[in-house]
């Protein structure tokens, strides 16, 4: 199925086939949508991005399907979850992890440094599955909170059910003087 990006803001970025109707139209899905393709909808009516995959029916109505978005919590809440039995998955690079990491964290890199850039770890899901079961309670952290959010989204999409992203990552963890190992 071909997918179209459907954005409620005027700034589309590099999305091909993107359309940007006024926000009031998007809330009710009254705008004209392509009838034979999927549509990604960004709902910006509140402060959190809520992405949905929507498809049009034979009558042109839109049926929306929610895409799983990870829950993000502050580091102090993440620490409480770890104390309550959640396991910590650190998705930073091995070099970042070796400098220091939260106590009892397991490192499975989401990305690897290659030259001056980064590439996604092609074995990420398989490696995570070797340490965790799909229903394990897992908190996921990275350096600043961005990579862990992407990793959390991938894990939810892969069927993991108890995923919690750590907002602010290891930087916030150390700023709050939470326990680390070196």
UniProtKB/Swiss-Prot annotation:
It is found in: Plastid, Chloroplast; Thylakoid. Residues 1-65 form a transit peptide. The keyword Transit peptide applies. The keyword Metal-binding does not apply. Residues 82-182 form the Rhodanese domain. CDD domains: RHOD. GO terms for cellular component: chloroplast; thylakoid. The active site is at residue 142. Keywords: Chloroplast, Plastid, Thylakoid, Transit peptide. Coiled coil: none annotated. It comes from Arabidopsis thaliana (Mouse-ear cress). It comes from the Eukaryota. Signal peptide: none annotated. SMART domains: RHOD (SM00450). The lineage of its organism: Eukaryota, Viridiplantae, Streptophyta, Embryophyta, Tracheophyta. InterPro entries: Rhodanese-like_dom, Rhodanese-like_dom_sf, Thiosulfate_ST/Rhodanese-like. GO terms for biological process: response to jasmonic acid; response to oxidative stress; response to wounding. Induction: By senescence, dark, sucrose starvation, 3-O-methylglucose, salicylic acid, methyl jasmonate, methyl viologen and infection by the pathogens A.brassicicola and P.syringae pv. tomato. Pfam families: Rhodanese. This is Rhodanese-like domain-containing protein 15, chloroplastic.
């Amino acid at each position: 199925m071909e997918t179209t990006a459907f954005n409620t803001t005027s700034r589309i970025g590099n999305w091909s086939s993107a359309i940007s109707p006024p926000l009031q139209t998007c809330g009710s899905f009254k705008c004209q949508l392509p009838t034979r393709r999927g549509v990604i909808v960004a709902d910006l009516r509140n402060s959190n991005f809520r992405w949905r995959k929507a498809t049009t029916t034979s009558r042109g109505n839109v049926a929306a399907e929610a895409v799983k978005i990870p829950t993000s919590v502050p580091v102090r809440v993440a620490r409480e979850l770890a104390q309550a039995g959640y396991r910590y998955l650190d998705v930073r690079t091995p070099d970042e992890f070796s400098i220091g990491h939260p106590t009892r964290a397991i490192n499975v890199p989401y990305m690897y440094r290659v030259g001056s850039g980064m590439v996604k770890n092609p074995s990420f899901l398989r490696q995570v599955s070797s340490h965790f079961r799909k229903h394990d309670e897992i908190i996921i952290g990275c350096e600043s909170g961005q990579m862990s959010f992407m990793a959390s989204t991938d894990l939810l999409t892969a069927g993991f059910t108890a995923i919690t992203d750590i907002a602010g990552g290891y930087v916030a963890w150390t700023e709050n003087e939470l326990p680390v190992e070196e």
